[in-house]
């Protein structure tokens, strides 16, 4: 950082960031990031990448300084100069007048979840299929790897990615996830031990 810890905050915080919170609209079945507040900040991109995903590739890192916000948690995110900042750590300065944040510079996209039927019980306690409605939500797609499978009749290309979502977005293996009109992905693996986010290994295949 170009300033020391004793630098006057007014001269340090010469930029602006939007602090984003996740909101849910029940009528439209949509989760979306909305601005909680806009505040002065100092932001610089890091020379080191940020390992924000346990299963995906790294992203460019950023360091952010803001005045102390007691409500801020890693469940939130930020937007700076049109860039989405996925928060990965929050530290309070020794003077307790500012917070030093680490973030990954990512692209947040809107996706549609199409959950598969769940198994429930009817009035007679017999297993029955329970329809789960679809919903839209924001997520970050990061690359995992590509693989080519040779089959008897045709060759299929299998594309795997890692989907990183806010913690409240709960998917199961077998659920479908789609971005715009692209072919949908199928959730293959759920990684949900992190207290602030969920990760899903998703894949799709098509004839090459």
Model-inferred region functions:
Residues 154-173:
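A conserved acidic, glycine/proline-rich C-terminal tail/linker
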Residues 67-72, 166-170:
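Short, surface-exposed secondary-structure edge patches
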Residues 173, 180-192:
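Low-complexity, intrinsically disordered Gly/Pro/Thr-rich segments
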Residues 1-71, 84, 88-159, 191-208:
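N-terminal disorder-to-order initiation segments that are Gly/Lys/Arg-biased
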Residues 74-76, 172-175:
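Loop/turn positions that initiate beta-strands
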């Amino acid at each position: 950082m170009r300033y020391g810890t004793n630098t006057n905050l007014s001269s340090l915080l010469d930029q602006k960031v939007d602090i984003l919170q996740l909101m849910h609209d029940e009528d439209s079945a949509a989760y979306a990031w909305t601005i909680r507040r806009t505040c002065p900040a100092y932001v610089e991109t890091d020379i080191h990448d940020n390992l924000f995903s346990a299963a995906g590739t790294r992203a460019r890192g950023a360091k952010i300084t803001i005045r102390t916000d007691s409500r801020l948690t890693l469940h939130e995110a930020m937007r700076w100069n049109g860039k989405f900042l996925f928060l990965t750590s929050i530290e309070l300065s020794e003077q307790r007048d500012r917070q030093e944040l680490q973030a990954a510079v990512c692209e947040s996209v809107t996706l549609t979840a199409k959950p598969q039927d769940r198994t429930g019980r009817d009035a007679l306690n017999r297993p029955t299929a329970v329809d789960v409605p679809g919903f839209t939500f924001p997520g970050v797609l990061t690359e995992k790897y590509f693989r080519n499978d040779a089959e008897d009749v045709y060759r299929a290309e299998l594309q795997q990615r890692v989907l990183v979502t806010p913690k409240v977005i709960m998917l199961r293996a077998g659920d479908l996830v789609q971005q715009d009109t692209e072919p949908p992905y199928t959730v293959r693996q759920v990684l949900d031990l992190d207290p602030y986010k969920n990760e899903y290994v998703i894949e799709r295949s098509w004839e090459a």
